[in-house]
Amino acid sequence: MSSKYPRSVRCCLPLWALTLEAALILLFFFFTYYDASLEDQKGLVASYQVCQDLTVMAVLGLGFFTSNLRRNSWSSVAFNLFLLALGVQWAILLDGFLSQFSPGKVAIKLFSIRLATRSTMSMLISMNAVLGKVNLVQLVVMELVELTVFGTMRIVINNIFKIDYGMNMMHIHVFAAYFGLTVAWCLPKPLPKGTEDKYQTTTSPSLFAMLGTLFLWMFWPTFNSALLLNPIERKNAVFSTYYALAVSAVTAISVSSLAHPGGKINMTYMHNAALAGGVALSASCHVIHSPWIAMVLGLVAGLISIGGAKCLPVCFNRVLGIHESHSVHYTFGLPALLGEITYIVLMALRVVWASSNMIGFQVLLSTGTLSLAMAMSITSGLLTGLLLNLKIWKGPHVAKYFDDQAFWEFPHLAVGF
């Protein structure tokens, strides 16, 4: 019988992380340079503001978003920052190497950081499905694999399907959610008896998690429009995302009250469903020209998110044996699928209205890229999950799931365990 005491990562984590960081520094030294071309100062400032918004979403939004478990909030915030800092470095190099087939150094621009931050956010979303069940070393391995597969998928979509960066990034939520869920399916389960209390939420952590939701809610229009170069598409994305978020927030509170026998509002439902509209608009926001379409999509996404939160843990997760701790499926996965299907339907309607073979071809491309994203996320997630089960990573024992005390120093405690 294996020990229930947490396995120390004192040697494994510093060795792995610092070696990786040293390798990244060498790669940046030999293969990158700052782009020296003159840019319009006003455009540079605007571009930096977009980078700043994305960083706020990644650090504060996704960091606090997963801090609702009362004994796992420290890991949520700090691991999120660590993985973002490491992932952006790897994503910049990866995008540079994959996007230029000819040998030479990679030019680093603000757009490179913007693209890398969005790519890394896919990992931060996937992490929600396994947070509390893996250590930081396993998360680093998971990040390297996911960012590599995600970057490769985008390059394949860009070069084979001829879809630009703004469009092929719309699969980020679908890829991230189902990659994370597949990894979670591979990890040891179920939770042993006596640790259910660690999976409970309390007032203060739930409030911080709601703070993360608010940061994400405020900056989601920037997230959906960050990589769009056409001014009209960017305007449509900002407007449509805002209306969808507004309706999903109203839906979250209203339907949460309706779902409770006493008419009380569930903070967890609010925490998840308020963002559903923004997630659902990630694929189609740039092609929606009327507010009512975005509002209807936000309403449906909110309903799906709350319905998933109420039914999926019983009907779906238990059947498939998936235990994911932070509502990834019905906060990101299902609303994102709704958005992808909506985009395909909107493009199909344009075929009917315009009788254009080119638009019809684009519908087929959109369906193909969605299928590719799903296939690559599930396949790579399965392989990553099997890789994380190897004993060399010193993963935590199931008795220490969702327990910050397994990784953090608590000076006020006289006895560690």
Swiss-Prot record:
<dbReference type="GO" id="GO:0072488">
    <property type="term" value="P:ammonium transmembrane transport"/>
</dbReference>
<protein>
    <recommendedName>
        <fullName>RH-like protein</fullName>
    </recommendedName>
</protein>
<dbReference type="InterPro" id="IPR002229">
    <property type="entry name" value="RhesusRHD"/>
</dbReference>
<feature type="transmembrane region" description="Helical">
    <location>
        <begin position="203"/>
        <end position="223"/>
    </location>
</feature>
<feature type="transmembrane region" description="Helical">
    <location>
        <begin position="44"/>
        <end position="64"/>
    </location>
</feature>
<feature type="transmembrane region" description="Helical">
    <location>
        <begin position="331"/>
        <end position="351"/>
    </location>
</feature>
<comment type="similarity">
    <text>Belongs to the ammonium transporter (TC 2.A.49) family. Rh subfamily.</text>
</comment>
<keyword id="KW-0812">Transmembrane</keyword>
<feature type="transmembrane region" description="Helical">
    <location>
        <begin position="172"/>
        <end position="192"/>
    </location>
</feature>
<dbReference type="GO" id="GO:0008519">
    <property type="term" value="F:ammonium channel activity"/>
</dbReference>
<dbReference type="GO" id="GO:0005886">
    <property type="term" value="C:plasma membrane"/>
</dbReference>
<dbReference type="Pfam" id="PF00909">
    <property type="entry name" value="Ammonium_transp"/>
</dbReference>
<keyword id="KW-0472">Membrane</keyword>
<feature type="transmembrane region" description="Helical">
    <location>
        <begin position="12"/>
        <end position="32"/>
    </location>
</feature>
<comment type="function">
    <text>May be part of an oligomeric complex which is likely to have a transport or channel function in the erythrocyte membrane.</text>
</comment>
<keyword id="KW-1133">Transmembrane helix</keyword>
<feature type="transmembrane region" description="Helical">
    <location>
        <begin position="238"/>
        <end position="258"/>
    </location>
</feature>
<feature type="transmembrane region" description="Helical">
    <location>
        <begin position="358"/>
        <end position="378"/>
    </location>
</feature>
<dbReference type="GO" id="GO:0097272">
    <property type="term" value="P:ammonium homeostasis"/>
</dbReference>
<feature type="transmembrane region" description="Helical">
    <location>
        <begin position="265"/>
        <end position="285"/>
    </location>
</feature>
<dbReference type="InterPro" id="IPR024041">
    <property type="entry name" value="NH4_transpt_AmtB-like_dom"/>
</dbReference>
<dbReference type="InterPro" id="IPR029020">
    <property type="entry name" value="Ammonium/urea_transptr"/>
</dbReference>
<feature type="transmembrane region" description="Helical">
    <location>
        <begin position="287"/>
        <end position="307"/>
    </location>
</feature>
<feature type="transmembrane region" description="Helical">
    <location>
        <begin position="125"/>
        <end position="145"/>
    </location>
</feature>
<feature type="transmembrane region" description="Helical">
    <location>
        <begin position="77"/>
        <end position="97"/>
    </location>
</feature>
